[in-house]
Amino acid sequence: MPNIKVKKLSKDSTMPTRGSEEAAGWDLYSAEDVLIRPGETKKVGTGLAFEIPKGTFGAIFARSGLATKQGLAPANKVGVCDSDYRGEYIVALHNHSDEPSMVHKGDRIAQLVLMPYFAYPMIEVDELEDTERGKGGFGSTGK
């Protein structure tokens, strides 16, 4: 398994950590103090840049504790970090609560999960193969 190269963009940045040996996600830490008011979205820097292997991408997910205790979660629900991106990983956090929330430098703000992907070529066609489901969507298969 290859090593993931991580560049600290400031000496005070915190390297990602995993909560347990089997944890799928790496905790990402805030590199700054940020106040997020109710209904507001703020970009929070991690102070880190990554070099992840080709054929994989980084998915940035909410941390369950931050979402349930402070109402903070990534604004775009899941962030996608491509393997050729070399800039700082920044998490856009949205405050879903009725109270202001302070993110402190060193707080865990999200989790990064590395996943493989398939880059299949796409072609335009006039017709698609029929299936039993057809065009049924949005609950069409039941509750």
Question: PLM ranges: what are they?
Answer:
Residues M1-K143:
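DUTPase catalytic domain/fold
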